[in-house]
Amino acid sequence: MGLVTAWADRPLTFYFISMKRDKFIIMKRYSLFLSFLIVILAGTAMAERLTIVAPVANIRSGPATNSDILWKVEKYYPIFVIKKSGSWYQFRDFEKDTGWVHKSLVGKLKAVITKKDLCNVRSKPSTKEKILFTVEKGIPFKVLKSKGHWLNIEHADGDRGWIHDSLVW
């Protein structure tokens, strides 16, 4: 598939040329659509899910160490990056709160956080298995592996077990 542009006394037009059954097909698309597509794809490329890897991280109001500390989070706290400024990430969390964190405090580790009150963590991936412990909303875990809709998780303190994916973000 090729891309050819045509310059004239009208808005920029793109012609997409493809070959189908030994015949050339030319499709004309206007720059507005292509511009829209580029903006959408650029925004998607920036969006990235990361995890706090430091024992504790300060969440700040802006991209600087002298910005106010809004709150603190613990290890394995998952974030969704919405903007980058230098060495800082602006993010949204599971409660749709936003803040800034320095890139040295995050990594690409797979992690989840409980989104419901009183979530059971079990010995094996089934509701029929023994409950090892129960956690409140907002507790982060590293994901070790998955089996169907179940996640084998580990807390920063070393506690492990299985949790259903409907209970986490």
Q: Where do the PLM segments sit?
A:
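Bacterial N-terminal signal peptides that target proteins for export
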Residues: 22-33
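SH3-family beta-barrel domains
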Residues: 45-61, 71-75, 82-123, 131-139, ...
